[in-house]
């Protein structure tokens, strides 16, 4: 992310921009673990950068016990999220701040980042993971959904698509990142283990489940 990207200008149109570029695929990716009951046991979720709130609303609807803290830098995106979740507003807390700052909660058992980590520079991911980790219960689960560059014949088309998306967001929001970070290495170094993965579109889109090992330590601890 480097400098602060401004998503306010595209908040109202973001859903339709998403549909125009990749259709409903990102929603399928977001819903994957939730619709299969993998998140039913969560009681306090930290949702970072959910944008207009479609995932947060679905989580609150499907899990009637969970409380959600949603953090986003964009005031307009948070406004859309709150309107979408107004029926369950008693179980929702919203915080407008840069996700690269300190986390405001403790006792989190579920973290969700859908298409957020790819907005960060490679050297920003591990510090974020360390800060989030300090807020988590042992055994907490982290859902990560991202674009990826698959091996094989789709590698070059995938690179072209990802490059074009980064260019579009640099123009529309001022995003300064231009390549996918290594989030898997950062999570492993901070004590998380991969427990599930689903790939879409030949590996161009992936959603993963990571679990914080009970005795894990972050680098430097």
Enumerate the predicted regions with their spans:
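Conserved alpha-helix/loop element of class I SAM-dependent methyltransferases that forms part
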Residues: 24-41
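C-terminal alpha-helical "lid/dimerization" subdomain adjacent to the S-adenosyl-L-methionine
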Residues: 145-190
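Core SAM-dependent methyltransferase catalytic element
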Residues: 190-193, 198-221
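N-terminal, positively charged/glycine-rich alpha-helical extensions of SAM-dependent methyltransferases
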Residues: 1-13
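A short glycine-rich, Lys/Arg-flanked "PGG" loop and its adjoining helix->strand segment in the class I
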Residues: 126-138
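Residues lining the SAM
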Residues: 114-117, 145
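A short acidic, Gly/Pro-enriched loop at the edge of an enzyme's catalytic core
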Residues: 103-111
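Class I SAM-dependent methyltransferase SAM/SAH-binding core
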Residues: 44-46, 51-101
């Amino acid at each position: 992310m480097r400098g602060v990207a401004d998503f306010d200008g595209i908040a109202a149109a973001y859903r339709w921009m998403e549909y125009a570029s990749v259709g409903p695929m990102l929603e399928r990716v977001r819903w994957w673990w939730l619709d299969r009951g993998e998140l039913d046991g969560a009681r306090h979720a930290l949702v970072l950068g959910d944008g207009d709130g479609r995932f947060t609303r679905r989580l609150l609807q499907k899990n009637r016990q969970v409380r959600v803290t949603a953090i986003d830098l964009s005031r307009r995106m948070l406004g859309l999220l709150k309107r979408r979740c107004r029926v369950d507003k008693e179980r929702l807390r919203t915080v407008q701040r840069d996700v690269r700052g300190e986390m405001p909660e403790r006792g989190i058992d579920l973290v969700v980042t859908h298409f957020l980590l790819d907005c960060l520079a490679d050297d920003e991911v591990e510090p974020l993971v360390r800060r989030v980790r300090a807020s988590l219960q042992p055994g907490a689960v982290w859902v990560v959904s991202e674009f990826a560059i698959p091996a094989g014949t789709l590698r070059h088309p995938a690179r072209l698509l990802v490059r074009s998306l980064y260019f579009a967001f640099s123009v529309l929001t001022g995003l300064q990142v231009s390549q996918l970070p290594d989030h898997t290495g950062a999570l492993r170094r901070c004590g998380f283990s991969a427990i599930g993965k689903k790939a879409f579109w030949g590996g161009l889109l992936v959603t993963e489940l990571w679990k914080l090992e009970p005795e894990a330590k972050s680098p430097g601890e």
